[in-house]
Curated annotation (Swiss-Prot):
In cyanobacteria the RNAP catalytic core is composed of 2 alpha, 1 beta, 1 beta', 1 gamma and 1 omega subunit. When a sigma factor is associated with the core the holoenzyme is formed, which can initiate transcription. The keyword Nucleotidyltransferase applies. It holds the Pfam family RNA_pol_Rpb2_3. Coiled coil: none annotated. HAMAP family: RNApol_bact_RpoB (MF_01321). Its EC number is 2.7.7.6. This is DNA-directed RNA polymerase subunit beta.
Amino acid sequence: MSRSAIQVAKAATYLPDLVEVQRSSFKWFLDKGLIEELDNFSPITDYTGKLELHFIGAEYKLKRPRHDVEEAKRRDATFASQMYVTCRLVNKETGEIKEQEVFIGELPLMTERGTFIINGAERVIVNQIVRSPGVYFKDEQDKNGRRTYNASVIPNRGAWLKFETDKNDLLHVRVDKTRKINAHVLMRAMGLSDNDVIDKLRHPEFYKKSIDAANEEGISSEDQALLELYKKLRPGEPPSVSGGQQLLQTRFFDPKRYDLGRVGRYKINKKLRLTIPDNLRTLTNEDVLSTLDYLINLELDVGGATLDDIDHLGNRRVRSVGELLQNQVRVGLNRLERIIKERMTVGETDSLTPAQLVNPKPLVAAIKEFFGSSQLSQFMDQTNPLAELTHKRRISALGPGGLTRERAGFAVRDIHPSHYGRLCPIETPEGPNAGLINSLATHARVNEYGFIETPFWKVENGRLIKEGDPIYLSADLEDECRVAPGDVATNEEGKIMAELVPVRYRQDFETVSPEQVDYVQLSPVQVISVAASLIPFLEHDDANRALMGSNMQRQAVPLLRPERPLVGTGLETQVARDSGMVPISKVNGTVSYVDANAIVVTDDEGNDHTHYLQKYQRSNQDTCLNHRPIVFNGDPVIVGQVLADGSACEGGEIALGQNVLIAYMPWEGYNYEDAILVSERLVKDDLYTSVHIEKYEIEARQTKLGPEEITREIPNVSEENLGNLDEMGIIRIGAYVESGDILVGKVTPKGESDQPPEEKLLRAIFGEKARDVRDNSLRVPSTERGRVVDVRIYTREQGDELPPGANMVVRVYVAQRRKIQVGDKMAGRHGNKGIISRILPREDMPYLPDGTPVDICLNPLGVPSRMNVGQVFELLMGWAASNLDCRVKIVPFDEMYGPEMSNQTVQAYLKEAAKQPGKSWVYNPKDPGKLLLKDGRTGEPFDQPVAVGYAHFLKLVHLVDDKIHARSTGPYSLVTQQPLGGKAQQGGQRLGEMEVWALEAYGAAYTLQELLTVKSDDMQGRNEALNSIVKGKPIPRPGTPESFKVLMRELQSLGLDIGVYTDDGKEVDLMQDVNPRRSTPSRPTYESLGKEYEE
């Protein structure tokens, strides 16, 4: 036990701030990005050139937001600040200058936890990974198997320029994937003479052929070249020299149209070894000539020219919030520029002011569109703190300017050697997005150019130097170094002990002596993402299962009484703290006041800092957000200390599930195929009970016939059903509601047309106007029940912003406690998931030698084929820890402490546990890790010893309550007349192609017929069948399904004369059953078809 897992937890270096990616990017946008855009955008001159409008970007101001974060959530508002910028209008003729502060729009602000609040909902802007601008060299094989090379110059925005060689060794160029142009034609058009070009090239003899080809085509002067260029780029228009000149100028040399960006300029300078200054963001002649030179070197295979790998992380960069927002602001400002120019031309020059010129609408619209409907602006996943944190660290290759799922090949999705320590190789979704959506590794950070860096310790002469901050390297720099893994063994002085060290060098593995090592990885965890790093014994799990494990931790529902894991990895505290779900002390000081709603910390100067707590708020995923204080009055606290537990936290650590006693043994077939057998204790002791808060809302609208009214007086509803409503007709807080109960009473005025004939008759006789309204109340949907925890009323008078046409909106929040039940999904942390198949009484569960019944029985066959052995290690380590009454932290990849370390550590702990008084039965050396269990029903021992222990098990958000669903009569699809699908639409169960095959194979012809006709879309048949069932008559024969008729009509609409005929040659009329009065068939009523049958 000398260097054991205990020390591993100490070695778990503290991670950097995990949401830094979002925060620093937004800070850059406020400090630099926005100013950059405003400056690029001014001055704007009108078409005559006598008026100029300057934006003074550096002096922009943000006003304090109208609502704070909580208020914005409550009012469904956006947490945003108004932007004002100083504008200067210069009249060139009179020399007059007008200066004014102008409102240019609202900018949503980021909250402290890295999210945005848009219309009351928390949203996250996901980081996007795109191809970096720069120059790329590729090779392609033509159909004869000959290699040709090409070079593409890719800007941040603007036209692509692609140089390529062909089989005759001629150089061509394409602009934006148009037709090929001889490369020398472009050179001449750019005003370069033959000698200018030849002097720049290291192997001009290769280029001479292209010059000759250009001369043969009769293009020998700059003017001819420009004409030729214009013809190729704008075919069909009359070419002119000035047109060609302007075309070339705007396409590549105008900073408004063509921009390499800082990154593009940096990458081109680096690849082509140029020294062009950073602020020159357009193409230069030097760029083009160097690219040609490099391409020729590639073709001749000289001069150390290398091809580029576009999937290398040195060639892909991350665009975070700041940059995405900056691009959006640019779009808005470009639209604004057009408007300003028009207004300058139209308006009276003398009386114009900057405020009249600048219209904030286009900019507001662009920003709103980005936050509201961009693919990268996502509704935050708030199921638990880990889900929230991972969502903010997600990196997506999809989105505007990125890839699409369909076009992304295998290479883009694959793990690349440069991902090491930057993107997690494990955490990615299953299915069509696999490999396109990644997660940032734990220690990775994004540098100023948008490339992902990862930290290393420097090694000098075989000695590790751990002084100061570690050194961050981006992927292309790391390729040139020899890097040893983070788990190399070192002695006290930091000297590497091994004679030979495995290193990574230029994306290959080598073994070198310690003196040759340049860097060592910071920590073994730095390769994987936050979610994966919470899995203990991760190194013993197959990657596919580890992937499921890290994805399922994000779906764990916060439980009523969370319990932190017995076996953890040491990162739990940091995850809870950085997720933003727990309140953190802002100062050093002492706690001066604590209650359920607020904690006050008094700092050393005597100032009070109040931290407000969330009580039973609803999260985006309907789970419950709640804070419980964990500090007491008088406690000293330091900056960054956790003051209260959030949901799924205990003691400031993340606690997603419960530690339960698990046995790996089959039990009467109840855990066949990943099913799970659980004990009643989990239900009785509320171990897996969670609180879910559902939101119901109703709006009273203004209709043509008058306003809808929220009231207690509802027609045809008995007084007892109104018992829980207050005098306004809104449910009282604290009431318990079942499905079908009224939450908010609402009546809608109904027109004359809505009345049935008998009502009209009564009206004619008595002449009095009955209260002509119809009940339109908000009721609890089927399968839902719970207690009303909050009611919010929004009206115009209070100044709330309501949707157009609404007079009042009422929101009711209903909370329910859900105990675990058959059909719920549970999972461990190693991708071992299953559905509960049966809940057994405690006394029937198998029990341990000391009489403790186990909580869960899992199938042992779930382990070998899936190769996630980590669960067995966790089980036994948890067993030892619970018997020793301690908790264990084990960082993944513990081999640096010796071979087979996990095994040794677990064994050592189990032996230690068996030494406790009265615990000798805990560990049996003959059968290590197994115990002889007895059957709870008979008391007989089972045949074989069974692996038993404690593991951290989660309840996932896929709850059976949300999925179970039944339909009797419900809505039908309009065209096919088949029942809709899905729970939300009250849908039916789909009888698909394969189910039809099963019935066909069985020969169940009549069952199949009625499933395809009267139970689905034979309109006439289903109404008649309903009629006959109600009246107890025999069910008539099914007719033609509507979908068949639709098919026939579609074929007819193609102009095919197609019909259906009976045996005796009579044509069947497919249109006969459509009632001419009602084009949309209503739900069937008992008499809805006038056809009565002969008795």
